[in-house]
Amino acid sequence: MVEFMIDRASGMPAYLQVVRQVREALRLGWLHPGDQLPTVRDVVASSGVNPNTVLKAYRELELVGLLEARQGAGTFVAATLGGSASPESLARLHHGLADWVRDAHAAGLEDEDIEALLRVVLTNTPLSGNGSGPNTKGESA
């Protein structure tokens, strides 16, 4: 089950942090259709946010078809996001990326620098192996 981490100093509204974290968990395969999300009461107890904040996040995710609220039963994942990478591939990539982030910090980069560099690489790295041209997937970083 996902546990939400709310960063009050981030400047991002708490409900958007919940939405982002659910979307990330879906994209990374940590949540699957049928999985139950924490109850509003549990999220409030663990994070200290207002119940309406959690309800707003869950409602927004329900409106786009990612969650399903079942009366008296809770909130469940209705759909997933992301590609078809295996859990093993995701774990390997996560480990490699964590090493890269540690190296970037050791080189003196701050989190914002790392995010900017990653956006540039995502935008300018070709999806095919031919090494020419920017990312042509049609998505922005």
Describe the predicted segments one by one:
Residues 1-36, 42, 91, 95, ...:
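Extreme N-terminal segment that seeds HTH/winged-HTH DNA-binding domains in transcriptional regulators
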Residues 15, 39, 73-90:
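Short, cationic-aromatic polyanion-contact patches
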Residues 22, 58-59:
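Short, hydrophobic-biased segments on the C-terminal half of alpha helices
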Residues 30-35, 62-72, 78-80:
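Beta-hairpin "wing" of winged helix-turn-helix
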Residues 36-47, 61:
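A short alpha-helical element within helix-turn-helix/winged-helix DNA-binding domains
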Residues 46, 63-66, 107, 124:
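Residue cluster at the C-terminal edge of the helix-turn-helix DNA-binding motif
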